[in-house]
């Protein structure tokens, strides 16, 4: 055990709990375990986030100090965010919604991504713009062009629709279409709202 803490849960309603884990030593590979002292019991977890106490410039929900300082030391003229495949998402219902990346962390809608892992959006547009200000870099926001990533699609969709060895078919099913034209005005407004933000 490298660090431990006890959190008393005193409500049946949703509530945010915080604790600080201070490591007794450095380790290369660690694992977080949440254990219930009272059994049998049921605990529903909404979001678990491990976050460093020391952030770049002491910002709440800021970037890891060592990584952010490394970027700052490069003196970039601009910083691009998020990456292209993250912005375009894994399917039309998964295009990166910038409005879902601001506000309290626990209220941000998490995303699945093309690489098969969960993205909490702990780093959202607010943190991105603030970091750009902190290092005097121009922000270069990346937004989807109204279509999902060309590599998007679930594996079951590929397996169900592509005969073995049919590469053209596989490529065809990777693209899932774009935002319907009747929904495009709302999408364009979201883009304009980001410019105003």
Where in the sequence are the language-model features?
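Short beta-strand and strand-turn-strand segments in soluble, beta-rich domains
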Residues: 1-5, 13, 133
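Beta-strand-rich interaction surfaces with strong enrichment in secreted/lumenal proteins
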Residues: 3-10, 18-22
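Aromatic- and acidic-residue-enriched carbohydrate-binding clefts of CAZyme catalytic domains
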Residues: 87-125, 152-189, 195-197
């Amino acid at each position: 055990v490298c660090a431990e803490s006890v959190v008393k849960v005193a409500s049946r309603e949703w509530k945010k709990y915080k604790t600080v884990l201070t490591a007794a030593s450095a380790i290369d590979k660690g694992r977080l375990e949440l254990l219930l002292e009272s059994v049998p019991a049921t605990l529903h977890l909404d979001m678990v986030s491990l976050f460093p106490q020391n952030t770049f410039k002491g910002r709440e929900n800021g970037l890891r100090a060592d990584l952010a300082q490394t970027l700052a030391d490069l003196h970039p003229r601009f910083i691009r965010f998020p990456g292209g495949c993250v912005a375009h998402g894994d399917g039309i219902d998964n295009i990166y919604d910038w409005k879902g990346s601001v506000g309290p962390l626990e209220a941000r809608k998490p995303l699945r991504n093309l690489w098969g892992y969960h993205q909490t959006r702990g780093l959202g547009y607010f943190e991105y713009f603030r970091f750009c200000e902190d290092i005097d870099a121009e922000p270069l926001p990346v937004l989807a062009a109204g279509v999902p990533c060309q590599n998007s699609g679930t594996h079951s969709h590929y397996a169900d629709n592509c005969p073995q060895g049919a590469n053209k078919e596989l490529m065809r099913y990777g693209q899932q279409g774009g935002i319907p034209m009747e929904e495009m005005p709302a999408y364009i407004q979201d883009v304009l709202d980001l410019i105003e933000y």
